[in-house]
Amino acid sequence: MSSIRNTHWCHRCQRAVWLRARDAVCSYCGGGFVEEIDIGPSRAHRDVERDPTFDLMEAFSAFMRSRLAERSYDREISGRLGSAGSESFSNLAPLLIFGGQAPFRLAGGDNSSVEAFVNGAAPGIGIARGTNAGDYFFGPGLEELIEQLSSGTHHRGPPPAPKSSIDALPTIKITQKHLKSSDSHCPVCKDEFELKSEAKQMPCHHIYHSDCIVPWLVQHNSCPVCRKELPSRGSSSSTQSSQNRSTNGRENSRRRNIFSNLWPFRSSSSSSTQNRRDTNNTATAEEGHYHHHQQQQQQHQHQHQQQQSHMGYSGWPFDY
């Protein structure tokens, strides 16, 4: 029996194996839970490599390619797929959606391969090895999976333009100069402008019909031609107020710095003056006390001299 006809499926490894001995033992894990695949010899190799669910996954891959093509304006997707060249969408291989396990690759027809696309995108989303992909894709999680893969949390371009900015767009009159230049047609509806009709002019000088550009700006804050974003009307005032607050803050800080620099000197000068005053007062008080003491001593001496001069005797009580 050839190796092709002896192809078995190991339920433990969850893959097809070729038994090299008579014993029904997997050559990879050594387990005995193997089952012979009942297929014809002419289609054995091709059917082992290509699972029947590949057709379903290829259909799902085609659906995803169409959804990605519709969202080609998305910068992140464009940057991610741009390196693959102009054939990036057509060269996408069939997708294998799985979750919770390590990625793996399976060979498909025409030398293609199945690539892992989502690894546990969300709880309950994905298929594990050995499960039937058809049971999952037609199950209750299909809408949730498609919504996550088609929208996800990718960047969707500029946010909507503010209503004040839309109302502030100038309205101009179409002249012969416009009709003779590249601005003769509206970039949205491709209709030619009529002479002396009104049009909305963007800050980038591209002009549009009002009915064409306003619905676009309600969803995208950018010019459809050059992608230049529409500035917010309050940005200038907010910038000016921020500059004023910054200027006032610097002035207040400068004033505080000046006062903080001057204050120690004023404090030192004031302290020195007060110290000098206290010293002078102390010296004056001490000097006054000294003069008062001198005057008292002089008065005592003067009184003592007067007493001695009035007595006039040598100390005897009687004169002879």
From Swiss-Prot:
UniProt-listed InterPro entries: RNF126-like_zinc-ribbon, Znf_RING, Znf_RING/FYVE/PHD
One GO-annotated biological process of the protein: regulation of response to osmotic stress
Alphabetical UniProt keywords: Abscisic acid signaling pathway, Acetylation, Metal-binding, Stress response, Transferase, Ubl conjugation pathway, Zinc, Zinc-finger
Protein EC: 2.3.2.27
Pfam family, one: Zn_ribbon_19
PTM sites of type N-acetylserine: S2
Biased amino acid composition, Low complexity: 232-249, 295-308
Function: E3 ubiquitin-protein ligase that promotes osmotic stress and abscisic acid (ABA) responses. Negatively regulates drought-mediated control of early seedling development, probably by influencing proline content, water loss, membrane ion leakage and the expression of dehydration stress-related genes (e.g. RAB18, RD29A, RD29B, AOX1A, ERD15, ERD1, COR15A, P5CS1 and P5CR). Modulates bZIP11 accumulation during rehydration following drought.
Organs and tissues of expression: Expressed in seedlings and in flowers.
Gene Ontology MF: a single term: zinc ion binding
Disruption phenotype: Reduced sensitivity to osmotic stress, dehydration and abscisic acid (ABA) during early seedling development. Increased proline accumulation and higher expression of stress-related genes (e.g. RAB18, RD29A, RD29B, AOX1A, ERD15, ERD1, COR15A, P5CS1 and P5CR) under drought stress. Lower production of malondialdehyde (MDA) upon drought stress. Slightly enhanced pollen tube growth. Impaired bZIP11 accumulation after rehydration following drought.
Residues in RING-type zinc fingers: 186-227
Triggers of expression: Repressed by drought and osmotic (e.g. 400 mM mannitol) stresses.
SMART domains linked: RING
Transmembrane intervals: none
Gene3D superfamilies listed in its UniProt record: Zinc/RING finger domain, C3HC4 (zinc finger) (3.30.40.10)
Catalysed reactions, semicolon-separated: S-ubiquitinyl-[E2 ubiquitin-conjugating enzyme]-L-cysteine + [acceptor protein]-L-lysine = [E2 ubiquitin-conjugating enzyme]-L-cysteine + N(6)-ubiquitinyl-[acceptor protein]-L-lysine
Name by which UniProt lists this protein: E3 ubiquitin-protein ligase RZF1
